[in-house]
């Protein structure tokens, strides 16, 4: 079995977290397990389910520049404690640098930076985020994005690496007698002849 260590904000019912849980529920957990680095102190809605499914939740020191050395040590210790952890998958946009650098120092050979948003929020952390964005490609072995625009906005450019990918958001094509009221009619846009579809 290999374990994939995901770095997230916390495991509440956000878009990224819900997507990860949809995958987690359906993978063969005898072969692959998910663990989670959470970067907020607040417990997440999915925490109990993760533990029931066999996953671990690791509380980080937080994404604060003052905690950066402690954060690197935390990731190294987390990886060293379980040699089955083979992959670090960061979902924190530019701030994923913290987990990726820790994983690099721990010797993990697969370190994925995954961009999900099309912008970097301009808040008081914006200068730090822009700094991390420039360093992030050097810490990651793979740059993934939900779409090309997300890659160009959130991830600094680097010359083509074989592991860099763009993954469109998956849609469910399962027929439903009663689609939710907010579901868009998108058969024409996707080329499907009939039916409702919505992001799962």
PLM segments and residue spans:
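Membrane-interface segments of envelope glycosyltransferases acting on lipid-linked substrates or membrane lipids
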Residues: 1-200
């Amino acid at each position: 079995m290999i374990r994939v260590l995901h770095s997230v904000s916390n495991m509440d019912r956000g878009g990224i977290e819900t997507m990860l849980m949809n995958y987690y529920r359906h993978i063969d957990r005898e072969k692959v397990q998910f663990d989670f680095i959470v970067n907020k102190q607040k417990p997440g809605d999915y925490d109990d389910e993760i533990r029931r499914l066999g996953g671990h939740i690791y509380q980080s020191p937080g994404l604060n520049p003052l905690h950066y050395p402690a954060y690197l040590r935390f990731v190294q210790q987390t990886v060293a404690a379980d040699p089955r952890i083979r992959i670090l998958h960061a979902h924190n946009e530019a701030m994923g640098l913290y987990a990726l650098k820790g994983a690099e120092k721990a010797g993990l050979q697969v370190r994925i930076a995954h961009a999900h948003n099309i912008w970097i929020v301009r808040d008081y952390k914006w200068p730090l985020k822009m700094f991390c964005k420039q360093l992030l490609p050097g810490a990651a072995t793979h740059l993934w994005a939900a779409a090309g625009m997300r890659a160009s906005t959130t991830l600094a450019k680097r010359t083509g690496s074989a592991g860099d990918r763009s993954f469109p958001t998956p849609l469910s094509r399962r027929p439903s007698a009663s689609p939710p009221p907010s579901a868009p009619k998108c058969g024409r846009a996707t080329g499907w002849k009939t039916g409702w579809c919505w992001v799962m």
